[in-house]
Amino acid sequence: MEDLQTQMKEAVAKAAIEQIHDGMVLGLGSGSTAALMIKALGAKISSGHLKDIVGVTTSFQGEVLATELGIPLQGLSAVSQIDLAIDGADEVDSNFQLIKGGGACHVQEKLVASLAERFVVVVDSSKIVKTLNLTFKLPVEVLPSAWQLVKNKIHEIGGVSQLRMAQKKAGPIVTDQGNLVLDVTFAGGINDPQTLEKQINNIPGVLENGLFVNLADEVLVGEIVSGTPGVKSLQKI
């Protein structure tokens, strides 16, 4: 029997698919919930229920999965606009600000989200938080030659950084762009995401950080109500 978290993720992935229509250019996110959405999309396309779909992936992992499922893909540079991007998040606060980058894909994810006419975030209820960064560390992608410099600069603004290490190889995680990732914690969490996003990105050697500010249009939240998985839609007023 599936655990409750998996049931929530499956419910929210299916709800997201209902927003997809024929002829759309789609941003296909990364992570476990987004992977369930991509699988559901592949099933809709193969059954003929969705036609003329083009996907733009946010990670190599997503590209491999979409290709295996027969979803037509284009590179980011080949599209001028994305109709709808669907992606997960590691944390979401009440103002729709996000932390992403648990899979070290946040650079491509932010590019796709910023190009999308509509950006829908799919999460289970455990990802909804009052304050960002109290539980999940903020990923910052850095040039390999600059990681120590960036770590010191982040320390000057109150952050404690750790170089993200790989689990199945000796050494650090290397992103799809060939860079390294610092995972950063701020005491008391992040109370002003908009200012901090710019502040970190202004440090020389930083490519991008995992704060997604004012990008999400809707958050679909998988939840369990009376033992049954369901989905709650949160939209900006």
From Swiss-Prot:
Quote the CDD domains the UniProt record gives: RPI_A
Which GO terms fall under biological process for this protein? D-ribose metabolic process; pentose-phosphate shunt, non-oxidative branch
Molecular-function GO terms, alphabetical: ribose-5-phosphate isomerase activity
Keywords on record: Isomerase
Q: Which residues form a coiled coil?
A: none
Q: Which Pfam families does the annotation name?
A: Rib_5-P_isom_A
Q: Which InterPro entries match?
A: NagB/RpiA_transferase-like, Ribose5P_isomerase_typA_subgr, Ribose5P_isomerase_type_A
In short, the EC number is 5.3.1.6
Q: Name the pathway it acts in.
A: Carbohydrate degradation; pentose phosphate pathway; D-ribose 5-phosphate from D-ribulose 5-phosphate (non-oxidative stage): step 1/1
Recorded catalytic activity of this chain's protein: aldehydo-D-ribose 5-phosphate = D-ribulose 5-phosphate
| Active site, renumbered | 109
Q: Which Gene3D superfamilies match?
A: 3.30.70.260, 3.40.50.1360
Which residues does the annotation say bind substrate? Answer: 30-33, 87-90, 100-103, 127
Q: State any GO CC term.
A: cytosol
Q: How does it assemble?
A: Homodimer.
What job does this protein perform? Catalyzes the reversible conversion of ribose-5-phosphate to ribulose 5-phosphate.
Give the family this protein belongs to, as stated in its UniProt record: Belongs to the ribose 5-phosphate isomerase family.
Entries under HAMAP family matching the protein: Rib_5P_isom_A
Specify the protein name: Ribose-5-phosphate isomerase A
The protein's organism comes out as Prochlorococcus marinus (strain MIT 9211)
According to the entry, what is the taxonomic lineage of the organism?
Bacteria, Bacillati, Cyanobacteriota, Cyanophyceae, Synechococcales
* Gene from which the chain derives: rpiA
